UniProtKB/Swiss-Prot annotation:
The name this protein goes by in its record: Shikimate dehydrogenase (NADP(+))
Tagged with keyword NADP: yes
Residues annotated for NADP(+) binding in this entry: 78, 126-130, 150-155, 210, 233
Self-association and partners: Homodimer.
Domain of life of the native organism: Bacteria
Protein family: Belongs to the shikimate dehydrogenase family.
Record keywords, A-Z: Amino-acid biosynthesis, Aromatic amino acid biosynthesis, NADP, Oxidoreductase
EC number: 1.1.1.25
Length: 265
């Protein structure tokens, strides 16, 4: 029987998950298909029901459902529990399990750059579903200080309840940092801009955007223009997908140059 896997989100058009997972599915001769699905909040319950009935065999979750989907699940992995964020779902022993592969994805993507962020200061822009994963990964890497800024300050305050060590700063305010991470969806559209003083802050600072499609957002373009070191979210995306693939298929897919180049759009 051919198994069905989906990535759900809203928006979802930008997602390259099907391209990557179907490449690995074909490479490892797995009888499965992987598709993307634009979802409305009202459809979550039906979707989980279809996993129970094994009409769907696994899900990846993206914006804005990483927290929203938790009440519909039976159990969370340790990573999903501490982050309160789910990006991978599967059925085991008649239970629907939520897991988080973003923590590992972000951590590995950082460790494989030449940027050493241990004992450094990081500023995170955003307070959505992926941010808790980034905070946990940064702590594992032994970052010294985490600042957080979000357009809606209430969301940032909510996050601080779980991570009291972070310091909230006002949106648009600039501070001294070594690394800045765009964890918002600002950049998915070509005209999207994050209004910060790039000229003042960019030189020799590390700019990381979790967005991987487009491969270079205005955030990264502006940073590069003024001497910043830039990295998009492609490797984070690949490493989180690698772990999700292993959860579902018990195969660790190879991440080689062909895999990486596959996602160049």
């Amino acid at each position: 029987m051919k198994k069905t896997f989906l990535v759900i989100g809203n928006p979802i058009k930008h997602s390259l998950s099907p391209k990557l997972h179907n490449y690995w599915i074909k490479k490892y001769k797995i009888n499965a298909t992987y598709e993307k699905n634009l979802l409305d909040h009202s459809e979550i319950e039906d979707l989980i029901f279809n996993i129970r009935k094994e009409k769907i065999h696994g899900l990846n979750i993206t914006v804005p459902f990483k927290k929203m989907i938790i009440p519909f699940l039976d159990e969370l992995s340790e990573e999903a529990e501490i982050s309160q964020s789910v990006n991978t779902i599967y059925k085991r022993d008649n239970k629907i399990i939520g897991d988080n592969t973003d923590i590992e994805g972000f951590k590995l993507s950082l460790e494989k750059t030449e940027q050493n962020v241990k004992n450094k200061k990081a500023l995170i822009l955003g307070a959505g579903g992926v941010v808790s994963s980034i905070i946990i990964a940064l702590k594992k890497i032994q970052i010294e200080k985490i600042y957080l800024s979000n357009r809606t300050e209430l969301k940032a305050i909510e996050l601080k309840k779980h991570f009291p060590e972070i310091e909230i700063i006002k949106w648009g305010e600039t501070i001294d940092f070594d690394m800045i991470i765009n964890a918002t969806s600002i950049g998915l559209k070509e005209e999207d801009e994050i209004n910060i003083n790039y000229q003042k802050i960019s030189k020799d600072k590390f700019f990381y955007d979790v967005i991987y499609n487009p491969p270079e957002t205005n955030f990264l373009k502006n940073a590069k223009k003024y001497g910043g070191i830039t990295k998009n979210g492609k490797m984070m995306f690949i490493y989180q997908a690698q772990k999700a693939f292993f959860i579902w298929h018990k195969i660790v897919p190879e991440v080689d140059s062909e895999t990486i180049n596959l996602l160049d759009v």
